[in-house]
């Protein structure tokens, strides 16, 4: 890592990923409760918000937005702090996990970097800390959805909540079973989120017209992440089950889940990219209804319109 504050160094040194794993295994029902509560909020939250402000959903949406469509001043400032915090968090994770992946690729080749499972690297040391925190961070990232509701979203996009809940369940399962290929997931996701959440923070600060041209490129990077994820997963499964396979430090069930997850993301993100940037819908007339889709971890263009 380029710089590690002393307090963070102590957290890394004291991290006991094996104990965290054992707790997650013993309390696997917790992630199910969180997921069910989250899904309940997805479908009830917008309607509840409309009732709390004492009006219909359409009027609530209009009242929740400022003139530039990014939300009330309090919501907007909170979004800046939240997204900036997630970006900084992701930068720290990237600076720790990604160099290890690159070093493994250089020293061990693609097979070694993907299939050589080291328990110490996965559960202990500073790398293990950022792998574990990555898995657990999928819980607080659900707060993204709260901000969409506070901005007056009447219906949360499928890609938004599907992405959040599936990656949460997958990350919990992966940290419980251990996976040599998970370093790819963490390194890529940390890297993409470093840029994506910084984009959201700048947009909420009022610079959306400046950063908006970057939106399609960030989405392209997200799609490339899914392509690489599919390839890594298929490679691991081939080494595990294929004729002449050398074995791989992964769980077969976890890899099947990972493949379904990445393949579905690839389809959904690609479909969204085409709809947003290749065949975008006509913009509403001035003074007409807002076209904000508010897709966190989805179309960055739509989130900040």
UniProtKB/Swiss-Prot annotation:
GO biological process: fatty acid elongation; fatty acid elongation, monounsaturated fatty acid; fatty acid elongation, polyunsaturated fatty acid; fatty acid elongation, saturated fatty acid; long-chain fatty acid biosynthetic process; sphingolipid biosynthetic process; very long-chain fatty acid biosynthetic process
Single GO cellular component term: nucleus
Subcellular location as annotated: Endoplasmic reticulum membrane
Main subcellular location of this protein, as a coarse class: endoplasmic reticulum
Catalysed reactions, semicolon-separated: an acyl-CoA + malonyl-CoA + H(+) = a 3-oxoacyl-CoA + CO2 + CoA
Molecular function GO terms recorded: fatty acid elongase activity
The name this protein goes by in its record: Fatty acid elongase 1
Organism: Trypanosoma brucei brucei (strain 927/4 GUTat10.1)
């Amino acid at each position: 890592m380029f710089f590690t504050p002393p307090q963070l160094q102590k957290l890394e040194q004291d991290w006991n990923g094996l104990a965290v794993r054992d707790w997650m295994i013993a309390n696997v029902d917790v992630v199910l409760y969180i997921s069910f509560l989250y899904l309940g909020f997805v479908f009830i939250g917008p309607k509840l918000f409309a009732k709390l402000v004492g009006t219909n959903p359409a009027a609530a949406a209009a009242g929740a937005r400022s003139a530039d469509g990014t939300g009330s001043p309090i919501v907007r400032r909170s979004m800046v702090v939240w997204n900036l915090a997630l970006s900084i968090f992701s930068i720290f994770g990237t600076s720790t996990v990604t160099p290890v992946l690159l070093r493994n690729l250089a020293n061990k080749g693609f097979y070694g970097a993907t299939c050589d499972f080291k328990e110490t690297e996965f559960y202990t040391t500073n790398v293990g800390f950022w792998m574990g925190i990555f898995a657990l961070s999928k819980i607080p990232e659900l707060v993204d959805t709260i901000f969409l509701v506070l901005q007056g979203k009447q219906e949360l996009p499928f890609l938004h909540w599907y992405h959040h809940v599936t990656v949460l369940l997958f990350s919990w399962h992966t940290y419980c079973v251990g996976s040599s290929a998970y370093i790819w997931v963490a390194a890529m996701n940390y890297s993409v989120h470093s840029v994506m959440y910084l984009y959201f923070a700048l947009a909420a600060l009022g610079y959306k017209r400046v950063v908006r041209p970057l939106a399609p490129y960030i989405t392209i990077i997200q799609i490339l992440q899914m392509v690489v994820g599919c390839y890594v997963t298929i490679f691991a499964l081939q080494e595990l089950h294929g004729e002449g396979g050398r074995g791989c430090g992964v769980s077969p069930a976890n890899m099947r889940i990972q493949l379904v997850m990445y393949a579905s993301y690839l389809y959904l993100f690609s479909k969204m990219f085409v709809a947003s940037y290749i065949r975008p819908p006509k913009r509403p007339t001035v003074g007409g209804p807002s076209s904000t889709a508010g897709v966190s971890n989805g179309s960055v263009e739509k989130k900040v319109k």
